[in-house]
Amino acid sequence: MAEAFSNSLTRAVGVVTTYSGSTVAAASTAITVTAATGIGVSDLVDNANYIAGTRVKQIVGTTVYTHRASTNTASAASQIVNFLGVTTAYTSPSAVKSILIGGTFANNTTSQVNLTVEVFDQSGDKTVGIAHKIPVPTGSSFVISDAGKTLLEGLDEVRVYTDTAGAIDVNLSILTGVS
């Protein structure tokens, strides 16, 4: 396959499910919510009792289990917990290597939003953050460039999360067909 430059455009990124009145168990992976509607496995957990990048591992009834323990030392009741749904902004074609050259993440709302960008390595079934909880002011953007390029193997993904529904427009610059 010959090398080719392209842009991957995604409008209005951001899927958020919020539950108030939640309980975060002490130093535990358990969050008790009033209902689990709208929460999905692999959603990011946005709450002061969890470090950035914590994700939903399992849902049983109204208990959500995360892949890492909370940081609180006592049970925390009456918590507002946001569950951030993923938007896949780019998937490298099967059996094709691509390079993420750069990207622009523009805030299209009237308030500041927080942005998380991750790369999912399909062959290793691992996810790593490029940017976690980056504040993007209204009328502004966050740009990935100059800091190095990211190699994507076949079926690897660039995933985007925001703490506000439909808040970010994504423009990724990609070079495909590299060897």
Over which residues does each language-model region extend?
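C-terminal interaction-tip segments
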Residues: 1-15, 84-98, 102-108, 161-179
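Small/polar beta-strand repeat architecture
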Residues: 16-85
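Short proline/glycine-enriched turn/loop motifs at strand-loop junctions of beta-rich domains
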Residues: 36-40, 109-112, 166
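Short, charged beta-turn/beta-strand-edge "cap" motif at the junction between a beta-strand
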Residues: 49-54, 148-151, 164-166
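Beta-strand signatures of extracellular beta-sandwich domains
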Residues: 116-120, 171-173
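Intrinsically disordered, low-complexity Pro/Gly/Ser/Thr-rich segments with frequent PxxP/GP/PP motifs
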Residues: 123-157
